[in-house]
């Protein structure tokens, strides 16, 4: 048997079928093969990782053109600042986030009960 047959299968989860990214459930190294699972644990794809992707980070599961929307959990989370290939790490180096933090509200002062 070769060495790769002894290695634990690497995993990532995709939240919806419309998503262009999956979330790494393991630390992924360039060259790793990763099984993409749905929330129901069904294997919906497999791809070769082209960049190191830390646990909890996003990796592309389909080609994303420069200027195209990046979708996670069925929501647009940003726009690609460069072309992104399947298996690439998706983070601030290749997307422009559309996240807008909610306005800060002043917390009410605590009152002591008499």
Predicted regions and their residues:
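N-terminal small-residue-enriched
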Residues: 2-114
């Amino acid at each position: 048997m070769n060495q790769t047959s002894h290695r634990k299968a690497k995993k990532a989860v995709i939240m919806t079928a419309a998503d262009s990214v999956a979330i790494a459930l393991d630390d992924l190294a360039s060259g790793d093969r990763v099984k993409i699972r749905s929330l129901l644990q069904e294997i919906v794809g497999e791809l070769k990782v082209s960049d190191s992707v830390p646990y909890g980070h996003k990796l592309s599961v389909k080609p994303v053109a420069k200027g195209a929307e990046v979708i996670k959990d069925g929501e647009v989370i940003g726009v690609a600042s460069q072309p992104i290939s399947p298996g690439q790490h998706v983070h601030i180096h290749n997307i422009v986030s559309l996240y807008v933090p909610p306005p800060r509200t002043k917390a009410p002062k605590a009152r002591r009960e008499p």
